[in-house]
Amino acid sequence: MMHLYHSSSDRINKLITRAYSTSFSLGILGLNRSLRDPIYGIYGFVRVADEIVDTFHGFDKDTLLKRFWKDTHLALDEGVSTNPVLHSFQRVVNTYQIDRSLIDTFLASMEMDLDDRTYSQAEYEKYILGSAEVVGLMCLKVFVGGNQAKYEELTPFAMKLGSAFQKINFLRDVSADFNTLGRTYFPNVDLTAFDDDAKRAIEEDIAVDFRMGYEGILRLPKGARFGVYIAYMYYYALFQKIMRTPST
């Protein structure tokens, strides 16, 4: 009956994805059916870690994140977990040989969110790498299906697309992050005096990432291309809306 636990775990990650992310949900529906459950598995894992640091207020977030991190490695080592999210995720990681360094880099970026901070350039780049770029690489491992040469070819493009998506999230949520969570992700930006010039500089940086990300989409295997393009168009439309919105 293990297959029933496998499928139930996959469905839980699918429910999490649909509850939390319109863009990911739409994009996944555009993927080849064989790719959908693995990507749901990655998103479910990423979402739970993000929720620990962003919404588990009133609880010991540091302890919870460390426990989740430890449980992740136990699941990967043992090939099973009583946590359905981690069980589904470990199957994806072990099936597609996703490098564990990507997972640790992601979780390290979540750990950065435990402290209210204004990010330096180096911290900003480290956070983008961990919170977005390596997630793109996890997905890319699934998309290329074991073709290491294709993975290496598309790595810089996948990283730039993940970077663009995350920076758009930052720009969309800039006020809430600053006023509610005490975070300032963009380096060298004074959010108490945020103006159109500062906003435009960020947008120009995002546009560069977007262009390179699109080039990578065109090179993806056919089964993944349309789904990633849907997510790209969702974020591109959001980006256009943000660019039309004044800084204040």
Language model feature labels by segment:
Residues M1-F165, L171-T248:
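Catalytic cores of Mg2+-dependent Asp-rich isoprenoid enzymes
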